[in-house]
Each structure stands twice: as structure tokens, then as C-alpha cells.
């Protein structure tokens, strides 16, 4: 069974729209009279009962010819109509005129092509007025809307067209998806290996060797890809390090002196606090012993 092509469907839609418009126009005419009943029987109309009057054919109008003059002036006939004067151009002017008309200008178009400007308003395939109430149903409107698209917009508005998504992105999600796909392939191979072990010995060994080889190749590809990405990241890190430096901060001489002073004060403060803590601990121990003795 062969289905109609797109152009055939458009042609049929155009023809149906034209027939519908013609039928609507015929219904609007006041002179439209029914010559048949709903069942299909013939109905006698007034125009059929009355005899049409005979109309005589129109006669050709007689043209009166002007009387010829009996005498002539200087041996020649008098001319009633003046001849149109024809301008005779020189051959040089003719060449210049043709060059101007044929040779293209700076934009690459001849004057004749400039006169013929292409019409920017592209006509729709089917024209209809949706504002008229009761003329079209919703289904007819949808069909006419689909058929009335411009030819240039058919590719964008067609329901059958679709855009293939570009999967060549270098994002982390795309890499993870590719790794997941390869791992799912490996799992599928392992399952087929388990199923193949139930067969004959020779076939089982051959299938097992082939599947193991494919599995090793896939694992090697994954490791190679991971190493390549790691090498790229390390190289990028080295490039950044050469630009920024090793990140160490060096103190000036004054900063070193201030640092020593701060360190000395912090150590001396810590030693005093430690001595105070020791004294308080000893006092607490003596109090505890005194309480036990009492």
C-alpha cells in the first residue's frame, strides 16, 4: 500500500479549499435557486415555465466613408493623418544606450534586473478568513492553518521534522554517560558468558575467549581514556603553576623581626600561664589532702 506524498496532500487540500469557497460563494448569491429537491427529484422553477423572448443579434455599425476630393494639390493626394516622427539615433548613441541597459552596475545587477524586484510578501498556499462565524469548523481551521504555511517555513513548522541533538560535548556528564555505557556493555558480555557456559565444550571455550578479549579491550579503552584526561589535567595544572608560581610567600627583613617579637611574646605568655596553672594545681592537691586528714 503506497501512501500519498506531501505535495499530493497539499494539492488535494488546495482543491478541497477551492471547492469549499466556490460552494460558499454560490450559497451567498441571491439568484441561486434550487432546481432539485433534497431527495434528488427535479423541481420546476419559474424560469423554466416562462418562454424566453427572442433577442435579435446586434447589427454591425455602418461607418461613413469620407468623400474623396476631386482635385489634388501639386499632383499629390492631401494627407488627412500626420505620420509619427521617428527619431533617428546615431550609431554611437545606440551603443551607449545598450551598454547602459545591459552592463551591470557596482552591485552586480543590470537596470532591467533592478526594475524586477522580487516580491517579499510570499503568498500562502490556502487563503481563508477565520473571522467569519460558522464558516469553518475547528478541524477545518486546523487543517487550513497547516496547509497555509509558507514554503520557507515548512521545514520549521512540519510535525514530521526533528533536530538531532549534538552529543559531542566534552562535559563531565557526557564522559560519565560514555563510561556508564561501556560498563553496561561489559555487564551484558558477562551475562552472555554465563549463558554460553551451558553449551557444548568447544563452542563454550570459543565464546568465552572471544568475550574475554572484547572485555579486556573495553577495559583498556576506559583506562586509556582516564589516563589521557588525567594527563591533560596535570598539564593544565603545570601551565597554571608556571604562570602563578609555586605560591610561597617570603617575608622581608622588617617582617622577620616583627615575627620574632611576636613569637617571643607568645612563648613568654604561655610559660607564665603554665606556671600559674601548676601553682593552682598544687594548692588544690594540698587542700584535698587537708580535707582527707580532717
UniProtKB/Swiss-Prot annotation:
Annotated stretches, region: Binding to the N-RNA complex: 281-294
Q: Does the keyword Phosphoprotein apply?
A: yes
What's a single GO MF annotation on this record?
Answer: RNA-directed RNA polymerase activity
Q: Where is this region: Binding to host phosphatase PP1?
A: 123-128
Q: Where is this region: Binding to RNA-directed RNA polymerase L?
A: 251-279
Q: Which residues carry this modification: Phosphoserine?
A: 106, 148, 157-158, 168, 171
Lineage, top-rank taxon, reads Viruses
Its name, as the record gives it, is: Phosphoprotein
Q: Name its species.
A: Human metapneumovirus (strain CAN97-83)
